């Protein structure tokens, strides 16, 4: 601002003055600068504490933490990329006898074997290298085709000239003359050479044989090992035992002189001309493969490194009777069995390897003594002093060599077990056991803590309530000091909180509670109580589950039975049919009944389109079943198959209202009145005569024998159904009651007008009876004349005879329409003006008396004389009371 100096300028001036001033002032200035430097400004402090606000001090964005699965996936991806790069580098720079030290990618699973150990075993020629597998191989291939296939190049046609870089050129190991060099170049390899020629060629070409000890000792000056340490490393690396090869004292790797030919043939041709197939991956490899120690089956190295022990697991499903049973399995620990052979499933899977009779590529620089030890440990075919380099003598698969016919021990030095290439299996097993033990210990501690805490809470709960009950205000027993400790100054005696006096008294009165023995006993008791409560809870839960299952099964069974009953009802309804005739419910109904009676299935005509007949459908099946239980007719009786009632009274006793008299159809024996048939639905009234009219229906019904079934009233109905309920109901005892037209399921409007026309009373105790009959009874009751029961019966019979003769013209159409007519109908007609309605004793005939057992059937005229009575159907029932009276 104007000429004012800024902070920077002042600092600069101060510093310049300090430089040009005296030493005292300079030291003072330096102290000020250091103190200012030590002080922290407010902005810096806010930045440190996160109090600053502004764009430069904004909070960093939230970074999502990587999950374990994502980290594992990234690690596997890094390993895959590194493995691909290492494979490419190793295949270009390293090889062992024409094979490689890295996998060829046959399996894509993670390579969890120990790669340094496998590499060392392959360089030592104890395990076959990773040969390149061929998908297709033909024995007729030429050398250029074999070389191209072995190098992973496209196989050229047989007649095509191979490129110059495809066929290798031999490099002279020692300077030779031009003639010998040209001779070697002009020599054409012949596959059918004799062993002598091959040996001569091997002797003339020292580069194709093993390197001499002099050449092997050439890099002695560059060796990092001292002579003594190198000898120890060679001895340990030579492998006096199975675990002799160690990575800590591994000798130095050297590259043998490069020679692309073996016995004058290219290396690839020598390896693949007698190729064999791996039985596991089905790829073609050179015949120098690993062989199982147990069954001597070939297996490539890439398949061998995939076989391993199973993960640690509990010994479930193992054979406990096995003599070689692992004691760890009995203890319930985690176990991990050795890998089994994929061919014969023998445990302790291992392989042996016989290398080719030459060495190329990498090797270890070892001394002569180590060479002798290694040659003693190795088989004769893989010895460094092997004289023959012919593959026909060294190859175990070409038939000339004798195949091993017995297994090799798992402890043999030449056997490489799967545990050898995965030495960390024991560490994994111990780690799994330790992890399981930690989990078990944590669970035990958690449960113990829960028991202890729960026990202490239970003890405190019991002690609180116990003290409150013993020393509280509600206790009848006083406290030892005469003071009620439950009534404190706050008056919270019911709160359950102990007072200080109670605590002191309990501590003084029970000094042993704080001891360890008492606490231990309390914990044990609490544990037992908790276990008992848990057992009871589990038992109750199991019982509830059982009851629930039982109820569920019962509901299923009930539904099933209900469904079966409905099916049976439907089948019975179908079997009965729409018309009930001679084959209907009782099999003895008349022709008119079979013609005019329609059951309640809804097939008949409905008067006024009434919906009340729908209620009769349910009763049809029950009535059909009830009628099947009716008593069969006596075959000795006369008549055309007419049902007659079986009297249960004595022969001399008169018939009462309880005598079931069937007048044309079967009915239940419990019914007070017989019915001609059982139509559950409305009848064709226009086809019926006066027998089915309102008059006959009313006169056929006895007074008081029917009460209105209020549960069958249907407010949806409109119209009138007459005589629709003449059949037996579901209980088989409401036949007469259902015949009452006033008890019909139809509503009562439109019925009064019809009742007035026909002269029927609808109200009072005489509902459903003719007005003329009611008037006759009233007059008879006023006259007071009575008579004996016998004379009344005789008068009724005579009345029937006379009235039947006079009204024969009216009865016959009724019989034709309904098939039967009850006797009380004729009685009702005669009572109107006949003097026989009053007997000699002055007793009045009423409807409560039972009708005589006289049946008037179809086409049967009334009897006119005593001689003609014998010709009437059912004459025994009609004449028998007359004979008794006359006698």
From Swiss-Prot:
Residue spans of biased composition, Polar residues class: 193-207, 391-415, 495-504, 686-711, 836-854
Keywords in alphabetical order: Cytoplasm
Locations listed in the record: Cytoplasm
Skewed-composition ranges (Basic and acidic residues): 61-77, 505-521, 543-568, 634-643, 798-813
InterPro entries: Sip5/DA2 (IPR039301)
GO CC field: cytoplasm
Listed Low complexity bias regions: 381-390, 581-600, 716-727
Gly residues composition-biased segments: 44-53
Family per similarity comment: Belongs to the SIP5 family.
PANTHER family, A to Z: PROTEIN SIP5 (PTHR31315:SF1)
Record's function text: May negatively regulate the SNF1 kinase.
Stated name of the protein: Protein SIP5
Lineage of source species: Eukaryota, Fungi, Dikarya, Ascomycota, Pezizomycotina
């Amino acid at each position: 601002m104007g000429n004012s100096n800024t902070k920077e300028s002042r600092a600069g001036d101060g510093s310049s003055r300090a430089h040009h001033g005296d030493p005292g002032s300079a030291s003072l200035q330096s102290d000020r600068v250091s103190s200012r430097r030590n002080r922290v400004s407010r902005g810096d402090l806010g930045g440190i504490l996160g109090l600053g606000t502004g764009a430069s001090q904004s909070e960093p964005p939230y970074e999502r933490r990587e999950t374990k699965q994502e980290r594992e996936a990234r690690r596997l991806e890094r390993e895959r990329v590194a493995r691909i790069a290492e494979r490419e580098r190793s295949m270009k720079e390293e090889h062992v006898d024409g094979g490689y030290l890295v996998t060829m990618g046959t399996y894509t699973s993670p390579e969890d074997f120990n790669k340094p150990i496998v590499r060392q075993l392959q360089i030592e020629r104890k395990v076959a290298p990773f040969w390149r597998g061929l998908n297709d191989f033909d024995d007729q291939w030429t050398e250029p085709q074999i070389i191209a296939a072995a190098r992973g190049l496209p196989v050229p046609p047989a007649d095509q000239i191979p490129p110059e870089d495809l066929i290798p050129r031999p490099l002279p190991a020692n300077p030779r003359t031009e003639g010998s060099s040209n001779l070697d170049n002009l020599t054409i390899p012949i596959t059918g050479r004799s062993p002598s020629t091959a040996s001569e060629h091997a002797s003339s070409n020292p580069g194709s044989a093993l390197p001499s000890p002099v050449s092997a000792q050439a890099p002695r000056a560059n060796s990092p090992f001292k002579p003594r340490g190198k000898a120890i490393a060679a001895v340990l690396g030579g492998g006096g035992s199975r675990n002799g090869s160690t990575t800590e004292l591994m000798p130095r790797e050297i590259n043998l002189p490069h020679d692309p030919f073996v016995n004058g043939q290219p290396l690839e041709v020598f390896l693949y001309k007698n190729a064999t197939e791996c039985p596991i991956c089905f790829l073609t490899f050179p015949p120098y493969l690993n062989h199982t120690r147990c069954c001597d089956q070939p297996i490539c190295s890439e398949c061998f490194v995939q076989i391993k022990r199973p993960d640690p697991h509990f010994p479930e499903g193992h054979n406990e009777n096995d003599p070689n049973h692992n004691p760890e399995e009995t203890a319930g620990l985690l176990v991990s069995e050795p890998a089994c052979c994929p061919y014969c499933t023998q445990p302790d899977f291992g392989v042996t390897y016989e290398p080719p009779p030459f060495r190329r590529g990498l090797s270890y620089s070892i001394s002569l003594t180590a060479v002798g030890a290694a040659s003693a440990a190795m088989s004769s075919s893989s010895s460094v002093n092997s004289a023959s380099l012919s593959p026909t003598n060294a190859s175990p698969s070409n038939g000339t060599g004798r195949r091993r016919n017995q297994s090799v021990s798992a402890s043999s030095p030449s056997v490489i077990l799967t545990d050898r290439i995965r030495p960390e299996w024991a560490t994994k097993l111990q780690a799994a056991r330790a992890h399981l033990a930690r989990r078990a210990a944590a669970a035990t501690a958690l449960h113990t803590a829960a028991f202890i805490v729960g026990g202490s809470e239970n003890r405190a709960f019991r002690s609180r309530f116990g003290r409150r009950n013993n020393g509280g205000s509600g206790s009848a027993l006083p406290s030892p000091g005469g003071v009620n400790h439950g009534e404190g100054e706050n008056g919270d005696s019911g709160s359950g909180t102990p007072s200080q006096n109670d605590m002191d008294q309990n501590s003084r009165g029970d000094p042993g509670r704080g001891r360890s023995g008492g606490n231990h006993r309390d914990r044990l008791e609490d544990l037992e109580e908790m276990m008992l409560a848990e057992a009871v809870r589990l038992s109750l839960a199991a019982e509830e589950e059982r009851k629930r299952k039982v109820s569920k099964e019962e509901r299923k069974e009930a539904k099933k039975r209900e469904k079966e009953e409905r099916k049976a009802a439907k089948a019975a309804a179908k079997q009965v049919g729409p018309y009930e005739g001679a084959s209907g419910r009782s099999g003895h109904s008349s022709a008119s009944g079979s013609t005019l009676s329609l059951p309640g299935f809804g097939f008949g005509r409905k008067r006024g389109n009434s919906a009340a007949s729908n209620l009769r459908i349910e009763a049809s099946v029950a009535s059909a079943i009830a009628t099947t239980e009716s008593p069969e007719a006596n075959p000795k009786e006369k008549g055309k198959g007419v049902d007659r009632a079986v009297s249960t009274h004595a022969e001399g006793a008169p018939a009462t209202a309880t005598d079931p008299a069937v007048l044309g159809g079967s009915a239940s024996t419990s019914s007070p009145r017989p019915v001609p048939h059982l139509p559950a639905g409305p009848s064709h009234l226009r086809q019926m005569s006066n027998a089915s009219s309102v008059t006959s229906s009313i006169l056929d019904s006895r007074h008081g024998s029917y009460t209105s079934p209020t549960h069958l009233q249907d407010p949806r109905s409109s119209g009138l159904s007459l005589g629709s309920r003449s059949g037996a109901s579901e209980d088989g005892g409401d036949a007469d009651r259902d015949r009452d037209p006033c008890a019909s399921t139809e509503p009562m409007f439109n019925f009064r007008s019809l009742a007035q026309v026909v002269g029927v009373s609808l109200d009072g105790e005489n509902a459903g009876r003719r007005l003329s009959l009611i008037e006759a009874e009233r007059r008879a009751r006023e006259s007071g004349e009575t008579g004996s029961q016998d004379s009344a019966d005789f008068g009724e019979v005579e009345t029937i005879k006379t009235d039947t003769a006079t009204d024969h013209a009216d009865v016959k159409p009724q019989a034709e329409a309904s098939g039967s007519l009850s006797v009380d109908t004729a009685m009702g007609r005669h009572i109107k003006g006949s003097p026989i309605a009053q007997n000699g004793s002055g007793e009045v005939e009423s409807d409560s008396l039972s009708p005589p057992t006289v049946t008037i059937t179809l086409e049967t005229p009334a009897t006119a004389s005593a001689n003609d009575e014998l010709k009437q159907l059912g004459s025994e029932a009609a004449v028998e009371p007359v004979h008794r009276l006359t006698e």
